[in-house]
Amino acid sequence: MKDTVMTYLLENSIKFKGKPNPKAAMGKILGENPDLRSKVKEVNQVISEVLKEIETMSLEEQQAKLDELAPEGLGQKTERKRKEIELKNVKGNVVMRFAPNPSGPLHIGHARASVLNDFFSKKYNGKLVLRLEDTDAKRVLPEAYEMIQEDLKWLGVKVDEVIVQSERLETYYEYGRKLIEMGHAYVCDCDADEFRTLREQGLPCKCRDTTPEENIALWEKMLAGELDNVAVRLKTDIAHKNPSIRDFPIFRIERTPHPKNGTKYHVYPLMNLSVTVDDHLLGMTHVLRGKDHIVNTEKQEYIYNYFGWEIPEYVHYGILKIEGPVLSTSKMHAGILSGEYSGWDDARLGTLRALRKRGIRPEALYKLMVEIGIKQADVRFAWENLYAANKDIIDKDARRFFFVESPKKLVISGAENRKIDLRMHPDRSELGNRELLFDGEIYVSDDLEAGKMYRLMELFNIVVEKVENDIIYAKYDSDDFKVAKTNKASIIHWIPVKDSIPVTVIDENAEKIEGFAEKDFAVVKEDDFVQFERFGFVRIDEKLDNKYTCYLTHK
């Protein structure tokens, strides 16, 4: 909540030259965030705390903080920023690529790169290549080849061509050989620690001055499997200010069997060689990548220049800071193997499969990634913005039901049996009605106190008499809502014990919440979305016998 309040107050403060109007901000916060309307007191408290922080900031600091919290902006600012997302130097056909490593399925971080490349290739009627960068056998998960393509299809990313790097090794060998023949690369058998020491001092190793002829002979031995512990290095500036750019490696020996090639090959290109060759041969016009790849861009430009190739337009965007779910593929895989996680779609993970399982619609994620865009500033991934976009999509079709978690039996005396008809959706009468039958015994979620009055939602007022053996006993008081209001009675939802349906809801922490839903919940099908009133939106995952398993999507 604090980030949401901070965002609105900062926007308001900047609008009024550093003098925020908390009342105006409060109105906008509640107007655009219906879930906070029941928490006015708490929101007011947070506003007071946030105002103290804002008062210590200059206007420039306020703008910087707002850009961090809401990079896509609010209101009209959002529309303006959306119009600004475009590529520079677009000439003719645009060719772009999304290039993941097949070490597992895609996660939220991948979504940004895949969506932006798809967005621009569609915007400019271009072509999008999916390039699976699988030249490191140790990092390849065989099933990931298909999983990645399935994830992209779900996300709405249209792939025009699929390239698998492990199927192109002979092509990389061809260009590696050319670099050696031109004197731009050499085979190095120096000990790694020895080379590192020389590199840090800006000194060449003993292998750097060997002739192209000698290096070609060594290259042939590498390909024949006669050498180990050697690498091919690209000649750069040995005195470059960045030591990592000094004669970086472009080929290595790898004896680990490859999932696709087995042991047929044992010389594999490193990323900067294979990426450069592919980007050139596939005709990439624009390359989108994180600013953490700026050094790699400089490395790759050496190869472009040695071959006299045209360098594509590089766009380096800021880091997407994602808090919450696990994103490390190796940690996820290890957790799955150990049984800690149920699979790649475990609710605690940051995979697209996990988001899909929880009920996040691909259109919502796509929209948010386009709004985040390609700015160079680092960006915080705002879960609340994803949930808001998702709610806009699913709300209109989500039927409403009562759900009682951790149910407690409540027996009410003095009330006649009743039938309550409620709409399935407050704004869509065509979705029909649902029926609640009161017969004296109901389930509630709340711990009720003896002597207090409560209002049963859409029903009547009761007064609790006692709690005995985990059963709550109460008596009917009145129908009049004004009586409940006068007595400051809490309003609680309920369901009849009779015909109640057992439901398990799995939340974002993979915790199971057990409870009951009303009888008309039985009309839902797997993959439907519903809103459990005063609980949240859920996706129906499975029906087994008469029990349902759902995933909590968001509030």
UniProtKB/Swiss-Prot annotation:
Matching entries from SUPFAM superfamilies are given as: Nucleotidylyl transferase, Ribosomal protein L25-like
Coiled-coil stretches are none
Quickly give the catalysed reaction: tRNA(Glu) + L-glutamate + ATP = L-glutamyl-tRNA(Glu) + AMP + diphosphate
Tell me which EC number(s) this protein carries: 6.1.1.17
According to its UniProt record, this protein's enzyme class is: ligase
What GO cellular-component annotations does this UniProt entry give?
A: cytosol; protein-containing complex
Q: Which Pfam family, just one, is annotated for this protein?
A: tRNA-synt_1c
Keywords associated with the record: Aminoacyl-tRNA synthetase, ATP-binding, Cytoplasm, Ligase, Nucleotide-binding, Protein biosynthesis
Give the UniProt record's GO annotations in the biological process aspect.
Answer: amide biosynthetic process; glutamyl-tRNA aminoacylation
Q: Which segment of the chain is annotated as a signal peptide?
A: none
Q: Which PANTHER family match?
A: GLUTAMATE--TRNA LIGASE, GLUTAMINE-TRNA LIGASE
Q: What HAMAP family does the database record attribute to this sequence?
A: Glu_tRNA_synth_type2 (MF_02076)
Sequence similarity = Belongs to the class-I aminoacyl-tRNA synthetase family. Glutamate--tRNA ligase type 2 subfamily.
Q: What is the protein named?
A: Glutamate--tRNA ligase
List the source organism. Methanococcus maripaludis (strain DSM 14266 / JCM 13030 / NBRC 101832 / S2 / LL)
